[in-house]
A protein has these predicted regions:
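Small disulfide-bonded, cysteine-rich extracellular recognition modules and tandem repeats
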Residues: 57, 140-143, 249, 372, ...
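Processing junctions and N-termini across compartments
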Residues: 127, 131-134, 363, 420-423
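Radical SAM enzyme [4Fe-4S]-AdoMet core and its adjacent flexible, acidic
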Residues: 2-14, 60-63, 80, 152-156, ...
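Flexible loop residues that form catalytic
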Residues: 145, 186, 239, 313, ...
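Flexible mid-to-C-terminal extensions adjoining Fe-S/redox cofactors in radical SAM and related proteins
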Residues: 3-5, 9-12, 26, 71, ...
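Flexible, acidic/Gly-rich N-terminal and inter-domain linker regions that tether
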Residues: 1-123, 135-139, 425, 429
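Conserved alpha-helical substructure of the radical SAM core
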Residues: 57, 79, 83-233, 319, ...
Length: 459
């Protein structure tokens, strides 16, 4: 066993006193074997490490790693740890669990991915927008609507997708095993007058529908409002609990009373829903609002939102936070973790958890981008891209355009592009894509090493 690997892992799992306590509870439930516990420690400290590499790092066997993985399966203590606001890889673990379940439902999927055969993910993001947004959020990919546009990036060929085109596409996606539809990006979808018919058809086809919106354009009682009530999750982007800061970030005018209007729409959805949709808030930390995190938690609880996503600007649109500002952020997140609200779930992104724990976030890359296998995206003009970031004008590059679904069936586009290798070398990469890439590479490497899906710790 190499002391260096264990020491590094121990630093991660003991970076915070509460994290260390929860981790200790997980270890107590594990076998007493020293090597198994070392493997468990290193795995929990970085769950995307392939089993063979973990065995090499510890100078041990795959059987020891398997034993550590078994210690995770069905362990209530491990479940408490990996679902904790103190665990820096909570979202990574959750993604791994979902992926293992998906691959177990479709057993040939890993082999098809490895062979670069056509594969359509169970989750697809679509951008049924008008190719624009009525906000100018400072940290958003749409903050620049002059130079970084579909036209300047040569993504506007053939015009926008029509409502009929989207509805045809929905049928193709459903027929080919897609069941989760994410409507996020490409501008603000809710200002597209055709969106109600698109959402209604998606609901009729049985999709699980997630919508991300500013919330400004919702009108209670309208066809759009009724369509949103048929969705599963609706997340409002609210980046300040204070009207002045909200307007400064969003680019809205004081006379619009935008924050009040958005909060009213959020409340109307909560009031009119049956069981679904769940309704939450997304808050992106940036120089304008870095000191408002605690106030935002109170705000979310006061609105009765089901959850609040706390994230950093993780693709560098705004200026980075200074060391002093990061200290303010860290102190607020630590205070929130000690006393979270009772009824509103606080979802802290992995990067923020690392910062609160006193560690630098992990932004390492892999050898190949596999984003097309877990969240491919279809942009407003019908271009299929490997991920949501490459469908946006700010980060789009024609080399990442996998084809158009406007004139071809989506599975044909996937098939034609399946042999194209996509390098994991983009200037920026969304945290969800970094997470997905790391986990897919781990699972594929593990299968090649003889670790079955039902042996994974995420099973």
């Amino acid at each position: 066993m190499t002391a260096a690997a264990v020491q590094i892992a121990s630093q991660v799992m003991h970076a915070d006193a509460t994290l260390a306590r929860i981790y200790a509870e997980a270890v107590r439930a594990a076998p007493a074997d020293e090597l198994v516990r070392a493997a468990l420690l290193c795995h929990l400290a970085e769950p995307s490490t392939p089993a063979a590499r973990l065995a090499d790092d510890l100078c041990t066997s795959l059987d020891i790693v398997r034993a550590a993985y078994r210690a995770c399966q069905g362990s209530a203590a491990v479940t408490r740890l990996v679902n904790s606001m103190y665990y820096p890889h909570r979202m990574r673990w959750s993604f791994a669990t979902t992926t293992v379940q998906e691959w177990q439902r479709v057993p040939d999927r890993p082999e098809r991915i490895r062979a670069h055969e056509p594969v359509l993910s169970e989750t697809v993001e679509i951008h049924p927008t008008r190719g624009t947004c009525n906000y100018r959020c400072a940290m958003c990919l749409w903050s620049d609507q002059q130079e970084l546009t579909y036209a300047t990036k040569q993504l506007d060929t053939g015009g926008l997708m029509t409502a009929g085109g989207w509805i045809r596409l929905l049928g193709e996606l459903r027929e080919n095993g897609v069941h989760r539809l994410v409507i996020s990006g490409g501008g603000e979808a809710l200002i597209n007058p055709e969106l109600p018919s698109i959402l209604t058809r998606a609901a009729e086809l049985g999709f699980e529908i997630h919508v991300y919106t500013t919330g400004f354009s919702i009108r209670p009682g309208s066809p759009l409002f009724e369509a949103l009530l048929r969705c599963h999750r609706v997340r409002f982007s609210i980046h300040s609990p204070e009207p002045i800061t909200y307007d400064r970030i969003a680019g809205t005018r004081p006379g619009q009373h935008a924050l009040d209007r958005v909060v009213g729409n959020l409340g109307a959805l909560l009031c009119e829903r049956d069981v679904l949709p769940t309704v939450g808030i997304g808050f992106v930390i940036q120089p304008f609002n870095y000191d408002q995190i605690a106030a935002m938690v109170d705000f979310a609880a006061d609105t009765s939102a089901d959850w609040l996503d706390l994230r950093k600007d993780e693709v560098g649109v705004t200026d980075g936070l200074t060391p002093d500002q990061l200290t303010v952020v860290r102190d607020q997140v630590r205070a929130i973790r000690r006393r979270p609200p009772v009824d509103t779930r606080i979802d802290i992104g992995d990067e923020l958890v690392s910062i609160a724990n006193g560690h630098s976030p992990d932004r390492s890359r892999t050898t190949e981008c596999l984003g097309r296998y877990f969240r491919p995206t279809i942009g407003a003009y019908g271009h299929l891209t490997p991920c949501d970031l490459k469908a946006e004008p700010r980060f789009a590059q024609t080399g990442y355009d996998l084809g158009s679904v406007k004139r071809s069936q989506v599975l044909d586009v996937v098939a034609v592009s399946s042999q194209r290798r996509v390098a994991d070398d983009c200037v920026q990469c969304m945290p969800s894509s970094r997470t997905g890439n790391r986990i897919l590479h781990k699972l594929l490497d593990d299968l090649a090493s003889g670790i079955r899906l039902d042996e994974q710790p995420f099973s």
